Amino acid sequence: MILELIIVLVLLVLAFKSLKILRPYEKGVVERLGKYQRTVESGLVVIIPFIEAIKKVDMREQVVDVPPQEVITKDNTVVVVDCVIFYEVVDPFNAVYNVVDFYQAITKLAQTNLRNIIGDLELDQTLTSREMINTQLREVLDEATDKWGTRVVRVEIQRIEPPGDIVEAMSKQMKAERMKRAAILEAEGYKQSEIKRAEGDKQAAILEAEGKAEAIKKVADANKYREIAIAEGQAKAILSVFRAMHEGDPTNDIIALKYLEALEKVADGRATKILLPVEATGILGSIAGISEMLSDPEDKGVSEVETESQPAEKPEKH
């Protein structure tokens, strides 16, 4: 009974030692009697207990935080720089057998190459060229760690800190630049405002002039229309008179009567002296005849028509 129990316990220990589980992000390097045997994927792995051993390798992306260090730039300025490195294992065999302490190895390698890269740059270039420094450092580290079975995914510079006096000088310079930029923007805004105002005044003057011109044109058109209407009316009136005279065949008595009405309008009741041509005596004679016809026979001796005739003045020849 005791022997059977011992056999069961031995079998359980052998089963526990022979079965290994690798997670999805892991790979394993199997060694047999201290010698590389094979590389296994994630899942359940069976090994020979006490003869074979397995070393697990994490295949996920990992981070190395490089400690801050002082670096001298090309113009002999001391700056404090630190960075982080993101890497992943691509070859478990090289990662296990080609480097003892990968974390310490890549840290020292990053610090050394960071000093070399920044040592070729001046302070201004160092402060404004982070992306370039990241790219160069990643390429150098990726090439150097290739034999370790790793790939450097990216490098990020976290801090570039110049000395305090330089920081103060840079702060003053930045403040002056901001004030200069603000003054330029203010002047540019005032300039644009004045341009817009001038354009608005110009447009208003143009619209006002166009409005006045349009009003003058409309007044002129109205006067023109009125004059044309008056002229057309007068023309029609004259045409009607001539037509009536032509159709009615007026006598000298009617003409003389109309002549008398015209003289009355000309005189207009004022003390006016009218000079008549010699040819008008015939018409006045007709008027006298009309007056005798219209007057009462008893009054013929009382009324008189005085006429004054005077030859028409002829213009002097010069």
Swiss-Prot record:
Keyword annotations from UniProtKB, A to Z: Membrane, Transmembrane, Transmembrane helix
Keyword Transmembrane helix: yes
Transmembrane segments: 2-22
Pfam families in UniProt: Band_7 (PF01145)
UniProt protein name: Uncharacterized protein MTH_692
InterPro entries: Band7/mec-2_domain, Band_7, Band_7/SPFH_dom_sf, Band_7/stomatin-like_CS, Stomatin_HflK_fam
Family membership noted in the UniProt record: Belongs to the band 7/mec-2 family.
Membrane protein topology class: Single-pass membrane protein
Region described as Disordered: 295-318
Compartments where located: Membrane
Assigned GO CC terms: membrane
CDD domains found in the cross-reference section: SPFH_paraslipin
